[in-house]
């Protein structure tokens, strides 16, 4: 399931500080439950993963579309996506699992559920070494999103640590050719970290990051 690469571009580049200003979800809002997997003889791990992948992909599209539209229903669809992705057999579709936690974390942050969002980003970061290669954009994105939620929560030391982890990863050789969108993301991370350092009274360190972002 690689559809997320195009669908999530806009959402992943949106600052969580902006998303977090949306209206809280209404108590009665709920998405219909996900379709249960068909019953029958036990499935092989591959067959189970393939069946789950189809549902996870459909929920991902709904999750991202509703989140982009700032619709509170995104919380339910993103949660269903996360819950189904967690049912993949161990060590299979790790990137799908990782992205499901990321998207649900973004949805929670969008509607001001900061602590719950942090828990999702914690789970995402824990999956990173199993799901993606060093130097990949997804590796940096996981730390970047957690850095932003730490910033919202006023935990600046932890935010600084995660920004550094995201930047350090981007300085490693990329496993695939770097696209313009990935380069924009790298620059965004550097500039956000520079802004944090400036507020923390570290202008020289902030200036170094801004210089790197300009390259």
Identify the function of each model-found stretch.
Residues 68-69, 111, 153, 200:
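Structural motif corresponding to the intra-repeat A-B loop/turn of tetratricopeptide repeats
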Residues 44-50, 83-95, 127-135, 171-182:
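Flexible helix-coil transition and linker loops at the boundaries of alpha-helical arrays
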Residues 20-79:
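N-terminal leader/linker segments that initiate helical-solenoid repeat arrays
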């Amino acid at each position: 399931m690689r559809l997320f690469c195009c669908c999530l571009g806009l959402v992943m580049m949106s600052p969580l500080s902006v998303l977090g200003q949306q209206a809280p979800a209404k108590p009665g809002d709920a998405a219909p439950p996900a379709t249960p997997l068909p019953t029958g003889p036990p499935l092989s791990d591959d067959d189970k993963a393939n069946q789950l992948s189809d549902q996870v992909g459909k929920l991902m599209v709904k999750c991202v579309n509703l989140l982009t539209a700032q619709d509170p229903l995104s919380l339910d669809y993103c949660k269903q996506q996360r819950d189904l992705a967690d049912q993949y057999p161990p060590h299979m579709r790790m990137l799908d699992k990782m992205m499901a936690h990321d998207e649900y974390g973004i949805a929670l942050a969008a509607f001001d559920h900061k602590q719950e969002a942090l828990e999702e980003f914690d789970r995402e970061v824990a999956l990173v070494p199993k799901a993606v290669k060093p130097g990949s954009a997804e590796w940096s994105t996981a730390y970047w999103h957690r850095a932003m939620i730490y910033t919202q929560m006023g935990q600046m030391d932890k935010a600084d640590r995660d920004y550094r982890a995201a930047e350090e990863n981007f300085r490693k050789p990329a496993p695939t050719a770097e696209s313009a969108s990935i380069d924009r993301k790298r620059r965004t991370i550097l500039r956000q970290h520079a802004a944090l350092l400036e507020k923390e009274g570290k202008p020289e360190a902030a200036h170094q990051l801004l210089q790197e972002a300009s390259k």
